[in-house]
Amino acid sequence: MFPLSLLQPSHSPLCPCSQSALTLWPATRLIFGQLEDDILSMRNDLERRMQRVNEACRLLSQDTEMRRITDQKQQSRSPESEGTSPNSGKVGKDHFELMLNVRDFSPHELTVKTQQRRVIITGKHERKSDTEDGNYFHEYREWKREAELPEGVNPEQVVCSLFKDGHLHIQAPRLALPPAPETPIPISMDTAPRDAQELPPDAQTSNAEGEQQMD
């Protein structure tokens, strides 16, 4: 017959494990909460960094595109730009005129002035735009053309007008010269023989010496 102590079920080994699991669960949940917060913080920081990278790429793309468009415009206007070099204005019978393409500039960005006998046209464009991360985009463009005024044009009478299509028209009237008065030209009498006038001085001297020897 077995002793009674062997027949009684014993749960003593399981009790310490259950108590340890109940004791460690709050600490484990706290650790997982901290890890989750750290992961969220790292994710937010990564998103902010990605936004800055995207903003920088967008600005770089805009700058590259604007440079490409500007180069294309300059290449497309190269014949006209050559036509705006000094002494390139059209000189008519009664006026002087010059046509320039300034559609890239607004009226308040253009300046037209005369300096001695030259017409100087300048354009300056500047634009700044702020970004979301506190940076800014700066664009600056400067353009200049000169033309020589021909003789007979008064620099003080130069006028200019800007058309809606972006062309600047510069013109000035030519001064009307008074007609030359009728002036009689007197005829002077010369007593020297015509043959002697046509001979060179050396020939005339040799002829005179020959005549003296014959005498």
Curated annotation (Swiss-Prot):
Belongs to the small heat shock protein (HSP20) family. This is Heat shock protein 30D. GO terms for biological process: protein refolding; response to heat. Residues 72-88, 203-215 have a biased composition (Polar residues). The lineage of its organism: Eukaryota, Metazoa, Chordata, Craniata, Vertebrata. One of its GO terms (molecular function) is unfolded protein binding. The keyword Ribonucleoprotein does not apply. Residues 78-190 form the sHSP domain. Residues 63-92, 176-215 are annotated as: Disordered. Keywords: Stress response.
